[in-house]
């Protein structure tokens, strides 16, 4: 809730920076988080968390994971030498059984970051995300991914414009919408979606977090 994450060096971790919301906890609904002026690099340490644990699903070589949070702004960060992915925007546990848990990230804005050297040794040993990424990317690993998982109503009728992922980055960055829901339902007809224009839009800067 209402956090500024800035001026950090994240290195030699499994995942450099994690912005998570988890089910079955007394405090949920993470929102209004700014991640800026950080350096996240060489986060290629093997994941030693117990399998079955949410954190245990994070692949080695990840710069930043945004999971099941809303209103997150990521800007002016440097991502480099992460062997799987620089930024992953993904849904949380879809089968948690927690009626109060909303697993889908929404209103995420990513802009004015720098990226270099990614995806050169993706971790396919932990969790499903990296395995799915490698299969769908087919050798062309991206800097930023969105898993493309939406509530069924939005998958059919469209996502509200104020909840869409906004990606305002250099034209040289590589992006991939995994479109994972349709991949699992209609894999024969699935093709990688790398079109960044679907995610262009105006940045609405989040307010600075005030000290208590």
Question: What are the residue ranges of the model-derived segments?
Answer:
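Right-handed parallel beta-helix
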Residues: 1-15, 29-44, 71-81, 103-117
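Short, solvent-exposed loop/turn segments at secondary-structure junctions
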Residues: 88, 95-97
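Short, recurring structural edge motifs at helix starts
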Residues: 21-26, 61-64, 98-99
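Acidic, glycine- and Ser/Thr-rich low-complexity intrinsically disordered tracts
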Residues: 95, 103-212
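Short consensus segments that form the blades of beta-propeller domains
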Residues: 26-29, 54, 98-104
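Short glycine/acidic-rich loop motifs that flank beta-strands on beta-rich extracellular proteins
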Residues: 1-3, 10, 14-21, 44-51, ...
């Amino acid at each position: 809730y209402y956090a500024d994450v800035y001026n950090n060096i994240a290195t030699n971790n499994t995942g450099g920076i994690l912005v998570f919301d988890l089910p079955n906890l007394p405090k949920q609904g993470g929102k209004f988080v700014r991640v800026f002026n950080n350096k996240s690099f060489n986060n290629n340490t093997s994941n030693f968390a117990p399998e079955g644990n949410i954190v245990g699903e994070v692949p080695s070589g990840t710069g930043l994971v945004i999971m099941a949070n809303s209103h997150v702004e990521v800007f002016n960060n440097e991502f480099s030498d992460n062997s799987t992915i620089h930024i992953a925007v993904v849904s949380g546990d879809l089968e948690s059984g927690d009626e109060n848990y909303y697993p889908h990230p929404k209103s995420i804005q990513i802009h004015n970051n720098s990226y270099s050297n990614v995806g050169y040794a993706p971790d396919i040993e932990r969790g499903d995300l990296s395995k799915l990424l490698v299969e769908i990317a087919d050798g062309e690993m991206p800097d930023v991914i969105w898993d493309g998982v939406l509530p069924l109503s939005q998958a059919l009728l469209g996502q509200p414009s104020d909840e869409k992922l906004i990606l305002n980055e250099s034209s040289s960055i590589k992006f991939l919408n995994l479109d994972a829901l349709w991949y699992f339902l209609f894999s024969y007809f699935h093709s990688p979606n790398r079109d960044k224009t679907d995610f262009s839009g105006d940045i609405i800067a989040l307010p600075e977090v005030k000290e208590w």
